[in-house]
């Protein structure tokens, strides 16, 4: 989504997950719209942080009527991305943020700063796509995701993420109860 927003002339920014973080950031940068991977979409209509699924649906339908394009036709124009499901790894509340700090310190030694975002966990961007590991704000867990521009790219990203996590002291496949042969793409 970030690449698509930027290609369309928008100023896409990565920020912390969570309703209160999003509302505050929208006000700080005067953003007309914001969204999260969870599907929450925030629209700035007379105030910041208007998060209402029915309202968003009405806005999408209104846009489709204005343009004369069906939502199916619009979705068909979007690039196909390959992504893992959101993985939650049990991690004690008092351990998850220190682990993210250790992971960030390790990742800084591997990746160039322009390929690394440390706003809400550790997000690494490569030519294949991106991967993210962050501490959950709502449960005693780490949350992991990866998205690639093709299946092979996603497989490479997952292997990269796995290697980096192992170097930081975590075999996430064991933690998640997955065997090493399991493909997440």
PLM segments and residue spans:
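Phosphate-binding and adjacent anionic-ligand microenvironments
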Residues: 1-185
């Amino acid at each position: 989504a970030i690449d698509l927003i930027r290609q369309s002339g928008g100023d896409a920014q990565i920020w912390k997950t969570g309703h209160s973080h999003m509302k505050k950031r929208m006000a700080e940068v005067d953003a007309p719209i914001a969204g999260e991977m969870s599907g929450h979409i925030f629209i700035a209509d007379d105030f910041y942080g208007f998060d209402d699924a029915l309202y968003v649906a009405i806005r999408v339908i209104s846009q489709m009527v204005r343009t004369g394009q069906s939502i199916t036709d619009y979705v068909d124009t979007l690039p196909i991305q390959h992504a893992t499901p959101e993985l939650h790894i049990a991690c004690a509340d008092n351990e998850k943020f220190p682990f993210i700090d250790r992971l960030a310190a390790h990742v800084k030694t591997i990746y160039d700063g322009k390929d690394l975002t440390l706003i809400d966990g550790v997000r690494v961007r490569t030519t294949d796509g991106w991967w993210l590991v962050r501490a959950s704000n709502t449960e005693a867990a780490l949350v992991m995701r990866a998205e690639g521009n093709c299946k092979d790219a996603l497989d490479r990203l997952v292997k990269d993420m796995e290697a980096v996590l192992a170097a930081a002291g975590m075999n996430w496949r064991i933690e998640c109860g997955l065997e090493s042969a399991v493909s997440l793409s």
